[in-house]
Amino acid sequence: MDIDQYMTDLGRRARHASRAMARASTAAKNAALEAVAVAIEREADTLRQANARDLARARDKGHDAAFIDRLTLSDKALKTMVEGLRQVAALADPIGEISNLKFRPSGIQVGQMRVPLGVIGIIYESRPNVTIDAAALCLKSGNATILRGGSEALECNTALARLIGEGLDKAGLPQEAVQVVETSDRAAVGKLITMTDYVDVIVPRGGKSLIARLMEESRVPMIKHLDGICHVYVDDRADVAKALNVCDNAKTHRYGTCNTMETLLVARGIAAHVLPALGKLYREKEVELRVDSAARAVLTEAGVAPLVDATEEDWRTEYLAPVLAVKVVDGIDDAIGHINEYGSHHTDAIVTEDHDRAMRFLREVDSASVMVNASTRFADGFEFGLGAEIGISNDKLHARGPVGLEGLTSLKYVVLGHGEGRQ
């Protein structure tokens, strides 16, 4: 297979389809989503068989249990896919909305209209559910998309692509609006991220090594995040009960997510009141604590053990595991400084009853999501009321934070006049 030609053909078809999608009605887009949901329900056995072949190859290659779990298309995952499609169909369609319409002294009206980005390339790893999640959001937001999933899920992704195409066709929309790269050749990724004539944005969903590679090589703009080094700062004016609940949930609700707390900062004035209880809670849940000298002193006196001395590297590490870095800070100045120095600009939270300090934290912490008296685990499109998300961005341009339908659109200026000319 000539990869360059194959990918160029995908791009050309996607660009053509994107023009039809930009003018597609809400009713047609919703009909396509419902048709895909029905097709998945009807072809569940076919999808399971395709997934079984993917799983067999993955096991033969020696992939670990965690990888196999991500790759598995369970009955629950199939149900979630169907529910997700219908949830996206129920979301308000942002395309065509005109906002900020203002009369100008010249007689014209100037506003902004929300429009699709165009063609979105999505690169992801072993989760077949991403194929449906991404296709649904791109479809509803009026975009065409090229999906490049992990080679280990190729059989399942190809089967899903057929069902998506069927749904688009039934709704009178071009099947080329959602295309799956049907080759495991890694050169396809290299080509996709350089096709500036056909692809408007790349959304990578995967591990740090994948994102880092794409950041170096992509010529197409990206919506992405590299790390999720999230902090909770317990202020010396915190409610202790709230602090315990927030810090417990932020770390132990799920260990392997990008919005999980990786560093706990505690104000010196409250450390003796909150750290012993937190230390015992974490040790009961077998969380390894990597502590600075001040935190070690408080925790040792409380009988919390074992403890590991933190290094400079710990403040910069996304563990994605039951490991937590703990540091005692002098106060809010120290906490904000630490977060802006070592954090990844993803999600950070303060626990405090002091309104002025809370507002200062919100203003000065340079992150995509900043929270007061709430767990970092809330940094999620569904929890934010976006209905769904295609990913989380910690960049500052275009989309920041959880990226839902609006994040897959842009604004263009529209001018309404009555024959006016500029004087």
Swiss-Prot record:
GO terms for molecular function: glutamate-5-semialdehyde dehydrogenase activity; NADP binding. GO terms for cellular component: cytoplasm. The keyword Amino-acid biosynthesis applies. The keyword Transmembrane does not apply. Keywords: Amino-acid biosynthesis, Cytoplasm, NADP, Oxidoreductase, Proline biosynthesis. It holds the Pfam family Aldedh. Pathway: Amino-acid biosynthesis; L-proline biosynthesis; L-glutamate 5-semialdehyde from L-glutamate: step 2/2. It catalyses: L-glutamate 5-semialdehyde + phosphate + NADP(+) = L-glutamyl 5-phosphate + NADPH + H(+). Its EC number is 1.2.1.41. One of its GO terms (biological process) is L-proline biosynthetic process. InterPro entries: Ald_DH/histidinol_DH, Ald_DH_C, Ald_DH_N, Aldehyde_DH_dom, G-glutamylP_reductase_CS, Glu-5-SA_DH, GPR_dom. It is found in: Cytoplasm. Gene3D superfamilies: Aldehyde Dehydrogenase, Chain A, domain 1, Aldehyde Dehydrogenase, Chain A, domain 2. Catalyzes the NADPH-dependent reduction of L-glutamate 5-phosphate into L-glutamate 5-semialdehyde and phosphate. The product spontaneously undergoes cyclization to form 1-pyrroline-5-carboxylate. Belongs to the gamma-glutamyl phosphate reductase family. PANTHER family: DELTA-1-PYRROLINE-5-CARBOXYLATE SYNTHASE (PTHR11063:SF8), GLUTAMATE SEMIALDEHYDE DEHYDROGENASE (PTHR11063). This is Gamma-glutamyl phosphate reductase. The gene is proA.
